[in-house]
Amino acid sequence: VASILLTGFEPYGGRGINPAHETMRALDGRVIEGFTVVGRGLPVSLREVRSRLPQLIEDIKPSAVICLGLWPGEAAIRLERIGINVVDYEIPDNDGALVNDGAVASNGQEARLATLPLREIEAALLDQGTPARISSTAGTFLCNACLFTVLDVLAARAPQVPAGFIHLPYVPSQVAELIKAMRSEAALEFHQRADIASMELSRIVNAVETAIAVTLKGRVRA
């Protein structure tokens, strides 16, 4: 079956949900441009990212790969341009590991560029009235590690397969919880919080569906 692999990170950092995981689940099994979306959850773990992603690509043999993650405070659909071979955490991953000044892979490659049609995706989303932008940093946590790993694996095994990473905003319920916590802690004033932007999950799901459609449009099903 011609397919696209869509991954979404599980909740992390004490958060109850992750819009990336919810979006992946919403689109799993959907047929877009004749390709079936194969959704898979990813633990927020460097160990799991390194082991699971190559295996998923080997098992599914997708025609494209799009990975999803959360960027707290982001107000738009954020299309990542580049993955770098750096791991540097500010908080532990879900294994409890706290990595500083590490590498995603030991192959010496410093960075890899996403191969999704980023400008076309951005234009399609903006035409739909959905805020979107191309970003030149995916950070140095697991989202970047995911992007670099996928691009690294595909460069060696299937360089014709387009792949990339999309960062998503909070959903409104998450921001509501942040504000409640802020009120109860009384440690910060409201204007000091920089992470209170959000987007409805339905709009996020539609945006990712559009990104998939733009990526796959005109591609021949294997």
Which positions does each model-derived feature cover?
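Small/polar glycine-rich anion-binding or flexible loop at a beta-alpha turn
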Residues: 139-143, 168-170
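N-terminal catalytic or cofactor-binding beta/alpha core of small enzyme domains
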Residues: 1-140, 151-156, 160, 191-222
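An accessory alpha-helical subdomain
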Residues: 163-178, 185-189
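Active-site glycine-rich loop that binds ribose-phosphate moieties when present
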Residues: 143, 147-149
